[in-house]
C-alpha cells in the first residue's frame, strides 16, 4: 500500500485592491487557493499619486487560480474581508515602494504586513483559510481509493 500524504492548503486566493496604470481597479492576488500552508508572499506596490499621505488596503478573497489571469482579478469576482489605512511618510512619491506581505498560517490566520520606508502596519484576519477536518478526511478517503484502485 502506498503512503498518501494530505497537505493543508488554502481554500481561497487572497489579494488587495490595486489601481493599475490604466485606472482600472482589480484584485492583485498575493497567495492562491491550493497553495500549501503555511505560506508567505510579498509584492511591491506604489502610491497612485505624488505626495499621497495615506493608502487604503482592501483585502479580498476570491477563487482565482495561480496563473496570468489570476494575478489580476476583477473586484466583483471577490469578497472584501477586511481593510485598513496606513499613513505614508512625508515626501513619498509615485516611485516610493510599498511592500505588502501576506502570511497565512495553518491555524487559519491571515496577516497583511505593509511597510513603506519607516512606516509599518499589520492587520490580521481569522478566516477559514484551510480545509476543515471533514474536508481533509474526505480528501484522504478519496486518495486512498485512488491509490488502492477502488
Where are these regions (language model features)?
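Acidic low-complexity intrinsically disordered segments
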Residues: 1-150
Amino acid at each position: 500500500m502506498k503512503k498518501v500524504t494530505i497537505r493543508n492548503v488554502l481554500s481561497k486566493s487572497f489579494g488587495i485592491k490595486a489601481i493599475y496604470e490604466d485606472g482600472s481597479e482589480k484584485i492583485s492576488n498575493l497567495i492562491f487557493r491550493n497553495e500549501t500552508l503555511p505560506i508567505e508572499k510579498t509584492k511591491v506596490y506604489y502610491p497612485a499619486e505624488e505626495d499621497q499621505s495615506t493608502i487604503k488596503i482592501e483585502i479580498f478573497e476570491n477563487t482565482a487560480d495561480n496563473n496570468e489571469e489570476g494575478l489580476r482579478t476583477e473586484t466583483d469576482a471577490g469578497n472584501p474581508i477586511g481593510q485598513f489605512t496606513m499613513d505614508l511618510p512625508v515626501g513619498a512619491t509615485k516611485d516610493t515602494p510599498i511592500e505588502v506581505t501576506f502570511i497565512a498560517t495553518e491555524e487559519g490566520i491571515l496577516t497583511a504586513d505593509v511597510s513603506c520606508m519607516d512606516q509599518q502596519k499589520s492587520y490580521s484576519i481569522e478566516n477559514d483559510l484551510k480545509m476543515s477536518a471533514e474536508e481533509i478526511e474526505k480528501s484522504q478517503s478519496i486518495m486512498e481509493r485512488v491509490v488502492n484502485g477502488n
